[in-house]
């Protein structure tokens, strides 16, 4: 009879292990959300090369800018928050890896019981002291793949946090570069405006002299004076933008607001050849797209976990240790005890908790799939936008340069004609105003080209290493 019981206990775990092959958990397959869509450009080559594989140090070569990027990657608050999210996800991953192992608990216990005189043993003992030193071991068979899916969900969550960390790095590099270039553009606009103010002060003196000579009226003097004040107001706005941008730039570096040292806009050159790669590379290079897919994997595996709750769970529990009424005999061989239990639990009625959890997991899985698809569409749009913006900015620089040259020449001619009495002052004022606006627009065009290059770098996945 004892042998029969022993065979039953040996057979139980063998059956449990053999049933583990009967998984109901589905294996993840990448959804059909990515198609070989084409970028809307004929200018850049679509081949295996991709500037996302190029380190940011090869794209942003300004020595001060590279130093700021390195400082930002080290100190930026968003980066440090992302690192902590990775650490938290890694802790869950370690937990998931141990899901197949049994749980072990130890227990040391002293029990004192006062007995009623009318109880079963009250006439023999007034009180009982019991001492126990024991341990218990519990193991659940992963028949339906719940533990495996939980482990994979934790793994996907960890990889998602890593990709999200990389996405924060790419965005930070782009933000630092873009803000730096914007500061350079403001420096140039401030320089031009200050130069314009000095020229208009000189023009005001000349106009006043012409009025004394009877060549212009008081109206001409006041219009020149008004143009001077217009330029001074523009300078105030530009310096305000400069201060606000410097404060924002300092925050990107993880620093308090401060003055930012920088070079000149004229020194900035685009030395890296722009390769956009092929559309499918977005899956490998865009960290936000990678994070979106891992989020979908996480939701998929959690749906497997929710589905497994419909099926019975098989557990094997063993307990043993020492138990005695006398502490002196606690470690005596006669105090040994042991228990081995195999259990099968099938959910029957639980207030629809399991079905609700499963339906919610299906809805969250579909949300994650749609977010993954949306991230692909957004990435394609951002690449197309950045490509066209770069092409347009490059073309506009040439046009704006010609426009400024024409206005500058017109200003020079009109002032000469005015001094010789062959032009009215309205022509001079118009030419000067157009020349200033055109020159400021030309600076913006140079900045827009650099900004488009930064956006293209980020849209393609950005070499954040």
Walk through the language-model features, giving the residues of each.
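Short segments within alpha-helical structural elements
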Residues: 201, 230-258, 306, 402-460
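Bacterial Sec-dependent N-terminal signal peptides
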Residues: 1-34
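Sec/SRP-type N-terminal targeting helices
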Residues: 80-81, 97-98, 141-169, 219, ...
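A small-residue-enriched
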Residues: 22-40, 70-142, 174, 242-260, ...
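Periplasmic alpha-helical coiled-coil/stalk elements that build and connect Gram-negative outer-membrane
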Residues: 23, 147, 156, 163-278, ...
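Regulatory alphaC helix of protein kinase catalytic domains
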Residues: 43-71
